[in-house]
């Protein structure tokens, strides 16, 4: 923390993006002390450092601050009601960040794209590529979000000098099962390898909200940014991968 404090005091950045998190929900349930330290205490320390240096914080949060029990998509002013420890600590961190009205909270959901850190899409593609079955929940919904579009929305927040809460998430509320089917179809894999399962059959420790889908219309109104639907978002990833391979062959 001292290194970070010295860096911020030296560079005096206009914006600090806080994306620190343990993203494994079951890990958070089993390691509550570590989770609270990273999500809440570290956020409080970073917020204090940034406020002293007049740096805006953009805090990356989650749809899991909601319980997922309502049928409509959640708006930014809906009251958080997390049902697992990950969501609980992220909701606490949001409150800390928003004590400064200049700061920003970006809630996102099930980020997908090209790379190792986007776990669900990587799991689906790696499995299908090897001819293995993919087991995906048919009763858990998310607003799956294209990674590149999420980054572009952050750029818009900085450009507009926005503040407050924004739901920076994809436009389609989709189950993991349907999402996996779309990935298989767009990438030309066998859709029959996608198998539907219920969260009730799973041995996960942390409770998952059933439908914490996010309404992203504020992004369009305030930031002038529109997220893609799931079909177009997955197609963008496919085109990105194609472009990477074309560049590889041109170089070698």
Whereabouts are the PLM-identified features?
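NAD(P)H-binding glycine-rich loop region in Rossmannoid oxidoreductase-like domains
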Residues: 1-38
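Catalytic helix-loop patch of NAD(P)-dependent Rossmann-fold dehydrogenases
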Residues: 30, 37, 41-42, 65-106, ...
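NAD(P)-cofactor binding segment of oxidoreductase domains
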Residues: 30-58
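Conserved C-terminal active-site "lid" loop/helix of NAD(P)H-dependent oxidoreductases
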Residues: 175-181, 198-237, 241, 245
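SDR active-site strand-loop-helix element
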Residues: 19-20, 57-62, 106-108
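Mid/C-terminal beta-alpha module of Rossmann-like enzyme folds, strongest
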Residues: 153, 160-204, 245-248
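NAD(P)-dependent short-chain dehydrogenase/reductase
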Residues: 95-142, 147-156
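Substrate-binding strand-loop-helix patch
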Residues: 114-116, 140-149, 168-186, 236
